[in-house]
Amino acid sequence: MADGNGTQETQDQAPAINAMVQYTKDFSFENPNAPRSLGPQEKAPNIAIQVHVNAQQLAESDFEVNIVLEGSAGEGANTLFKFELDYAGMFRLLNISPNDMHPVVMIECPRLLFPFARQIIADAVRSGGFPPLYIDPIDFAALYRKRLDEVAASAPQLKS
């Protein structure tokens, strides 16, 4: 029941991001040079990581959001390990304006998924015989802005 100043109504209309379910869609870990690669290394390996965010609308307020993390340690014939993780969640977004919907889906939802994806990779790398790889936090807002800039740059330009 609402009190006299409308507090309950305000709470009912507050924006909300509900994580309905989270899941691994696809995962692979390769240790192509084991057991040779498991010994002491002369220097720290080169680690490369790529991040992709994808989303699709499932219903009016429901979205599936995926983080795809691909990475490797070492180079060429000296590859220590490779991984690819497609980690997803289904989110229900409530009371979010249409103008804010896309940024929320592409920034806030991946931000909620990331710690779980990071732990899956750390555990797999450790299980592969290496020290765990803890991926640095990702600035999904910067990633989103970069993607918008890339789309704008690739759009055909109208000539006047």
UniProtKB/Swiss-Prot annotation:
MF annotations from Gene Ontology: unfolded protein binding
Protein name: Protein-export protein SecB
Disulphide connectivity of cysteines: none
Keyword tags: Chaperone, Cytoplasm, Protein transport, Translocation, Transport
Subcellular location as annotated: Cytoplasm
Purpose of the protein: One of the proteins required for the normal export of preproteins out of the cell cytoplasm. It is a molecular chaperone that binds to a subset of precursor proteins, maintaining them in a translocation-competent state. It also specifically binds to its receptor SecA.
Domain of life: Bacteria
Lineage start: Bacteria, Pseudomonadati, Pseudomonadota, Alphaproteobacteria, Hyphomicrobiales
SUPFAM superfamilies, A to Z: SecB-like (SSF54611)
